[in-house]
Amino acid sequence: MTSTVKYTGNLRTVGIHISSSKRLITDAPLDNQGKGEAFSPTDTVATGLASCLLTVLGIKAKDIGIDITETFAEVEKVMGSNPRRIIEIKVDVHFPNTFNAKLKLILERSALSCPVAKSLHPDINQNITFHWPD
């Protein structure tokens, strides 16, 4: 088992990661009757995509002996209606260091192969942009 999730009232859930006992709290978003005091469930999907991209980048960087510490992603989730769903996830990945063209390509292709990116429904536009310093 990966986790347990409990509805605690007031449009909030608390998830417990079984192996670490870490908690993940979600609230309904402000635009859907919520307080917006925590990630919404759909925020966790968008954030999960960015986390997966960065994790896969970290694995590849470690394998090839380069450091990408301080690489970060900015995430924007776009919702649609009828039915209410995620229609686009925009992820801007910012690298603090530049590498040669070959290493950049290796890193970018590795990131795009992350399991979350490959698991999301094809109707969700994944707009992923990589930013390298000059």
PLM features: residue spans?
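Extended beta-strand/beta-hairpin segments
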Residues: 1-47, 55-134
